[in-house]
Design a protein with these regions (language model features):
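Catalytic Zn2+-binding segment of zinc metalloproteases
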Residues: 120-139, 181
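Solvent-exposed, acidic/flexible segments
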Residues: 56, 109, 126-127, 163, ...
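Short pre-active-site segment immediately N-terminal to the catalytic Zn-binding motif
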Residues: 50, 54, 99-114, 158-164
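A structural motif
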Residues: 133-153, 160
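Active-site His/Glu-centered metal-binding helix of metallohydrolases
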Residues: 107, 116-125, 169, 173
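Pan-zinc metallopeptidase signature
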Residues: 191-260
Length: 260
């Protein structure tokens, strides 16, 4: 799989804007100099459970299959105890993927593979450096109040904007690996947190149509919604579902589905 085939156009544009921001290169340099990536590796080894062929064999096999399909070097896979369904990937030189216990318990193995493929998409598209950087800046600011809105506000706004767009590229990777129908069901479970939800997996796509009508009803609705998501790390769930529902008709999606 090639990053260029799944990269969302808005992701590619946003990262170029980010790199042109004054002070951004210096932040990247400092982050690499002080090895913030090692902080997260220490957290993983100290508090999470590393998945292998012995402790969770079915999950590990599914993980290896996804990694092979995406075509990246195998990252480390961890499980952490959390009642919220979630997953993340960080690290530039030695990336890792972490899945919450709730996600593994509430989703089918195909749906978990979808989430793993999403995280592998971040690695394939080389998002992990900036993902790690964004998390580090945010956590340092929360802990030590080092970040002032005047100094880092524009950079943070730009980074969050890019991060939301990067999720769309990773979603394409997930849909290409497991199929868009499985992707839609996984997103539905992530949105509601219920493992045995019934009905069509395309419920979020239908809601997306309603949401878009809501935004178009008035300029005030559009302003409210745009301001509300400024510091969101992820696009709203209906927008993610909508984007993949559109992308499933593309030649890139069809090429990868036919080759698997």
């Amino acid at each position: 799989m090639k990053a260029s085939d799944i990269m969302h156009p808005e992701d590619a544009k946003a990262i170029q804007v980010l790199r042109r921001l004054k002070g951004f290169d210096e932040i990247v340099r400092i982050s690499m100099q002080y090895g913030y990536e090692q902080i997260y590796r220490g957290i993983n080894l100290g508090n999470l459970v590393k998945v292998n062929a012995h402790n969770l064999p079915n999950l590990y096999l599914a993980f290896k299959n996804v990694v092979k399909r995406v075509g990246i070097k195998e990252p480390e896979l961890y499980i952490y105890n959390d009642p919220e369904m979630n997953a993340y990937t960080y690290g530039e030189t030695n990336p890792f993927i972490a899945l919450s216990s709730s996600l593994v318990e509430k989703m089918t193995i195909d749906e978990v593979s979808c989430i793993i493929a999403h995280e592998c998409g971040h690695i394939l598209c080389k998002h992990t450096l900036y993902n790690t950087l964004l998390r580090t800046i945010t956590e340092l600011g929360n802990l030590f109040e080092l970040i002032s809105a005047a100094t880092f506000g524009p950079i943070l706004v730009a980074m969050y904007y890019w991060h939301r767009k990067s999720e769309l590229s990773a979603d394409r990777c997930a849909a290409a690996v497991v199929g868009e129908r499985t992707y839609q069901m996984a997103m539905l479970k992530l949105a509601c947190g219920i493992s045995d939800i019934k009905g069509s997996p395309y419920q979020l796509v239908e809601q997306a149509r309603a949401y878009r009508r809501f935004e178009k009803d008035s300029w005030w609705n559009r302003i409210q919604q745009n301001c509300r998501v400024t510091f969101y790390s992820h696009p709203q769930m209906v927008n993610r579902a909508w984007e993949i529902d559109r992308w499933k008709n593309s030649w890139q999606y069809k090429k990868y589905r036919e080759s698997l």
